[in-house]
């Protein structure tokens, strides 16, 4: 059993509780990779309270533990931030990913606005049994209420995605 907490690298003074670390989360298991001998697994953890409710997503990869041979450790490999960050936007309020972890939808829902959902595509590079993960913003969805305003529609308060990420 592993306990996962946000890194304490000095990048923030926010505690895990203040970050709302774990507010949203998703595990993806893409299958056997040609560059590794075991099935890859990814864990995405939302922290919408990070840095005065700016928010961010932590990505972890299931990997080899201290003994050097057993896969038993989640290791942080990336943080994902909004393309339009700002205090109070709460990026990471909800998140959803397809089964492979290649497509990620992340909502920002701050009080009094319509909210938005940012869609990211993984653009990782693999070589020599090592992978550098990256995500690129491909689309931003916003909510509009029936009266045409963008107030209080709570767009992105709930997310779902198909296994392949096309819907």
Question: What is the meaning of each model-derived region?
Answer:
Residues 1-167:
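Conserved beta-strand/short-helix segments
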């Amino acid at each position: 059993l592993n306990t996962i907490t946000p890194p304490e690298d000095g990048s923030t003074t926010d505690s895990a509780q203040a970050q709302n670390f774990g507010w949203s989360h998703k595990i993806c298991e893409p299958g056997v990779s040609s560059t590794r001998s075991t099935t890859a697994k990814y864990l995405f953890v939302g922290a919408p309270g990070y840095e005065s409710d700016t928010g961010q997503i932590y990505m972890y990869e299931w990997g080899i533990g201290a003994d050097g041979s057993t896969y038993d450790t989640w290791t942080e490999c990336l943080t994902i931030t909004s393309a339009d960050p700002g205090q109070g936007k709460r990026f990471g309020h909800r998140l959803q990913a397809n089964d492979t972890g290649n497509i990620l939808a992340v909502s920002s829902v701050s009080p009094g606005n319509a909210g938005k959902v940012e869609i990211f595509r993984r653009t990782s590079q693999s070589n020599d049994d090592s992978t550098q993960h990256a995500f690129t913003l491909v689309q931003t969805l916003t909510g509009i209420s029936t009266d045409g305003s963008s107030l209080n529609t709570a767009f992105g308060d709930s997310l779902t995605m198909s296994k392949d990420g096309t819907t």
